[in-house]
Regions:
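Surface-exposed repetitive/solenoidal architectures
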Residues: 1-212
């Protein structure tokens, strides 16, 4: 396959959004979706082998105060561990590169660089966390200041059993400018004190959308 670019602009009667309504699979080169407005993924995107995906959105306005979104609805973008993923928001936005996560250990590894950007390339089975850290489970990712994009994937059976203090959740606490989107938690058990939530324990400055 060769590189493909799909682009919308301000012409016509629509809002310049891109809708993915049929599944697409490719194994090499880059698929770029460049939307004047939002990108809505309603059918699976499957980037296998060395394929890459670039989602550029909100290009009809500058990055500052840009409210455009990437959303998934009953679909996911599946990325091989060798695939690459980038996003750019706004006409003058800076491209963000992401680390692709396909394993539970990689998910926990987000704690090593909380300013980076991460994307789920597949669903994650987190059942093994019930025996981690003397059976207290997954260690919360604290002070997360990057972007975490589930791209329609889920994390199942996450286990955390912590004390009554601290910020407890997959993302224990957020930093300025953080974005968490398009990810779901299914099953599992998360317990702690007042600042506890399965997905985010304490969110004072971040943005969370299309997630559960």
């Amino acid at each position: 396959s060769t590189a493909v670019i799909i682009q919308t602009d301000s012409g016509g009667t629509g809002n310049g959004d891109i809708f993915v309504n049929s599944a697409v699979t490719w194994a090499a080169n880059k698929l770029t979706l460049s939307a004047y407005g939002n990108i809505n993924i309603n059918a699976d995107l499957n980037a296998t082998s060395t394929a890459s995906l670039a989602l550029n959105y909100g290009l009809g306005a500058p990055a500052l105060d840009n409210t455009s979104q990437i959303t998934t609805t009953n679909a996911a973008a599946n990325l091989a561990g060798t695939a690459s993923y980038t996003t750019t928001q706004g006409s003058d936005g800076v491209e963000k590169a992401y680390t692709v996560i396909t394993t539970l250990d990689q998910l926990q590894g987000m704690s090593s660089n909380v300013a980076a950007n991460y994307v789920l390339g597949s669903n994650i089975d987190a059942a093994a966390t019930s025996t981690w850290n003397l059976s207290t489970g997954f260690a919360p990712i604290l002070g997360f200041a990057g972007t975490f994009d589930g791209l329609g994937h889920t994390i199942s059976d996450l286990f955390m059993s912590k004390g009554a203090t601290g910020s407890i959740g997959l993302i224990g606490s957020t930093g300025v400018g953080s974005v968490i989107r398009n990810v779901g938690l299914v099953g599992g058990s998360v317990s702690g004190g007042a600042s506890t939530g399965a997905l985010v324990g304490s969110n004072a400055t971040g943005t969370v959308y299309n997630s559960y």
